[in-house]
Amino acid sequence: MSRPRQLQRWALVPASGLGLALCLLLGGCLDNRARPLLGLNLQLAHTAVNRDPALSSDWLALIGGREGREQVRLVRLSQGAPVPLPGLNRPDARPVAVAVDGWGERLALIRELEGRSELVLYRRSLQSLQLIPIEPAGVPHRLAFSADGRVLAVEVGRGGLSQVDVLELP
């Protein structure tokens, strides 16, 4: 008989009071503040400049540098370690924007080389770089991969207007 009485006592609590109690209990358990990844942030702080981050699954691509020499960097978040990108960074090119796919295999890069902007696709496993033509001609500014890495969206300046081109990648 004690169980029915306990149920009856709960039945006497107004629904709004029960809802308030539930919110207070759950609110105390949830921490909705962002937490910095201290180890990774300290590692990134060793570079004088870090900009244009692109985050995808377990990968962080960014442009970083010292003493005016910027280059694309790739970090595997689960290991907190940089990944080499042989053949991607050129001393005579200035990186503008970067994106990385969810597997860390493909990186898209906008860079300035000899006074012009170009879009290139880097395949990490092949250490290969492929120029992606912008048609009709324009100046690429920003980019983003689709979730599966097969499609690339590129913001392109044409005639003073910003447009978005969506490219299916080979």
Task: Please give the residue ranges for each predicted region.
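Sec-dependent bacterial lipoprotein signal peptides
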Residues: 1-29
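Sequence signature of WD/YWTD-type beta-propeller architectures
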Residues: 2-3, 29-170
